[in-house]
Amino acid sequence: MSTFFKGIKKPFLVTLVLLLVCGLAYPLILTGISQVIFPKQANGSLVIVNGKAIGSALIGQDFTDGRFMKGRPSAVNYNTYIREDKDSGNYAGVGSGSKNYAPTNPELVKRVQEDIDAFLKANPSIKKEDIPTDLLTASGSGLDPHISPESAAVQILALVKSTGLSKDKLETIVKNNTQGKAFGVFGEKTVNVLKVNLDIAKELGLFNKK
């Protein structure tokens, strides 16, 4: 029996030490460092207006008001549901993801055509072939808050009409919320739709400017 306990003593101690280091000390240290150095990012990059969180700079939203810029479609409604959706079965408990339909799938063809029709109605000066692809395709997570600069640009004229703001003002707002390539090399330039709409709302006086 003593031999048995001697045999398991070392692996037991190793397991205990790794549990304390990896399961307790490491997470606590990283959490502490992140809260000190990157507090905003560590807490979800929340966008605060007048003391209230209205969203996250990392999560897209479905903007239906004609005065605001539109983002990419989402197969999971940006993980935003009401109780009626859950009761009716429209909420499947999926927080992120996409339908992963084949290009010829009738459901995908229908959804894309509906999005094209809606976009052309809201942007009558734009031709179908000029609609950037990312405005018609959902991201892999369904939560992407960004669109391409081209997708932002094609919406400017419609926003001029719906908001009363000048074209130059809207282009400046878009420019101020455009993020360059990571390290100047990786990825593409992106525009944060939530931040653009936040600045538009400020210009329209929809809440107090701070």
From Swiss-Prot:
Membrane topology: Single-pass membrane protein
Cellular compartment(s): Cell membrane
Upper lineage: Bacteria, Bacillati, Bacillota, Clostridia, Eubacteriales
Task of the protein: Part of the high-affinity ATP-driven potassium transport (or Kdp) system, which catalyzes the hydrolysis of ATP coupled with the electrogenic transport of potassium into the cytoplasm. This subunit acts as a catalytic chaperone that increases the ATP-binding affinity of the ATP-hydrolyzing subunit KdpB by the formation of a transient KdpB/KdpC/ATP ternary complex.
Quaternary structure and interacting proteins, as annotated: The system is composed of three essential subunits: KdpA, KdpB and KdpC.
GO MF term (any one): P-type potassium transmembrane transporter activity
Record InterPro entries: KdpC (IPR003820)
Keywords: ATP-binding, Cell membrane, Ion transport, Membrane, Nucleotide-binding, Potassium, Potassium transport, Transmembrane, Transmembrane helix, Transport
Transmembrane regions: 13-33
Family the UniProt entry places it in: Belongs to the KdpC family.
Gene Ontology CC terms: plasma membrane
Organism name: Clostridium kluyveri (strain ATCC 8527 / DSM 555 / NBRC 12016 / NCIMB 10680 / K1)
Matching Pfam families: KdpC
Protein name, as recorded: Potassium-transporting ATPase KdpC subunit
Main location: membrane
Signal peptide bounds: none
